[in-house]
Amino acid sequence: MHVTIKNVPWKFKHGLIRKCCHFVLSKFLSPQKLQHIEIQIVGSKELMNKEGALGFCSVSDDHFGSGKKVPVWFIIEIDTRLDFKTLFQILCHELVHVKQYACRELRETYYPRYRKTWKGKDITDRYYSHSPHEHEAFRKELVLCEEFFKLGV
């Protein structure tokens, strides 16, 4: 797995961010799948004010047109005004979404029109709070974050 970090202050310890990515994704993905994953983590001030969220995970535009059926390139945006612990909790949440995309549980299509599916079921029109992929990410974020920091890293 390759992780690049952009616009994230050093106080968040870039090495620790990379370790967290590996820790979380190694719980869900095989070593073979993990070695192909590329994640760009982009810090953004005021993300909450601009977009109404503390973090986002998306399949990189590099994936589309690559001919690959399973996405392996991801972008995670995180609000850098967060405190240390919350940033890692949000990172864990977004990494659950990476797992969902990489395992093809969560899929988005843009042609002929936008559709979002979860395990084969169309969830395009569901409210954010009723989305099963968000329920899973919220259920796992704190547990993963606590497990990561219990390792004493």
Task: Annotate each language-model stretch with its function.
Residues K13-H36:
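Zn2+-dependent metallopeptidase catalytic core
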Residues R81, K85, E105-V153:
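Metalloprotease/metallohydrolase-associated module, dominated by Zn2+-dependent proteases
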Residues V3, C21, I37-I41, F74-I78, ...:
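Hydrophobic beta-strand residues in large extracellular and virion-surface proteins
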Residues N49-K85, V98-A102:
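Active-site scaffold of zinc-dependent metalloenzymes
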Residues M1-K13, I37, V42-N49:
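Hydrophobic or amphipathic, alpha-helical segments that drive membrane association/targeting
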Residues T86-E94:
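Short alpha-helical catalytic segment bearing the HExxH-like zincin motif
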Residues W10-R18, Y127-H130, E134:
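Generic detection of long, well-ordered alpha-helical segments
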Residues K33-I39, E108-T109:
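Short acidic alpha-helical/loop segments enriched in Asp/Glu that coordinate divalent cations
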